[in-house]
Structures are given as C-alpha cells and as structure tokens.
C-alpha cells in the first residue's frame, strides 16, 4: 500500500537531516540506503530521539521502498555523484512508472 508522500535514498548526514526536516514539516517519508544497517541505525536513532519518527519508514528492499510511495512517486537521491548515482537510478528504474519523478 502506498502511504508515504515522498521517498529519499541515501542516509549519510545530508540525507538524514533532509528526511527529518521533511518529517518535521508533516510529510510522511520512506527512506532507503544501499547498506541496510545504515537504515536500521537511523530508524533506531529516530525512534529514540526524534518527535517526528512516526512519519518516517525505513526500508531494506528497494522495491518495497518504491511501492510505499504515493503515485506519482517523488524520490530524492542524496548519494555520491557518478557511479553511485547511476547504480541507484538503475536499481530504481524497474520499479518506477512513467509519471514518477527522481530528484537528483
């Protein structure tokens, strides 16, 4: 079921802070990182310290991450430029539809 307003890929410092900012402004947000342990750590930190943690949902599977976002999907990429960005887009594409948006 698609319940999240927006998705964010990349949970380094900028990704974490942007995800929290979006959640703090009342939007539901799905988060994904290619290293599942990074997502797990971020979600555990949020549950313990962030009032808006209920608007954040972490995913270890990129397909489930995409499915959780309302159509047309809006996905923000905050990953290293170059090969990492290309690999992330390649992993997302099989799960996206024509009207979905990737913001890089």
PLM regions and their residue ranges:
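NAD(P)+-binding Rossmann beta1-loop-alpha1 motif at the extreme N-terminus of oxidoreductases
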Residues: 1-76, 91-104
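Short glycine-/small-residue-rich Rossmann-like dinucleotide-binding loops
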Residues: 79-81
């Amino acid at each position: 079921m698609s319940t999240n307003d927006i998705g964010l890929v990349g949970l380094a410092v900028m990704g974490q802070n942007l995800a929290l900012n979006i959640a703090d402004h009342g939007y539901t947000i799905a988060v994904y990182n290619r290293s599942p342990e990074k997502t797990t750590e971020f979600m555990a930190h949020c549950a313990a310290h962030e009032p808006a943690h209920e608007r954040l949902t972490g995913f270890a599977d990129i397909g489930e991450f995409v499915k959780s976002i309302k159509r047309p999907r809006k996905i923000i990429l905050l990953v290293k430029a170059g090969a990492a960005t290309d690999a992330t887009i390649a992993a997302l594409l099989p799960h996206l539809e024509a009207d979905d948006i990737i913001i890089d």
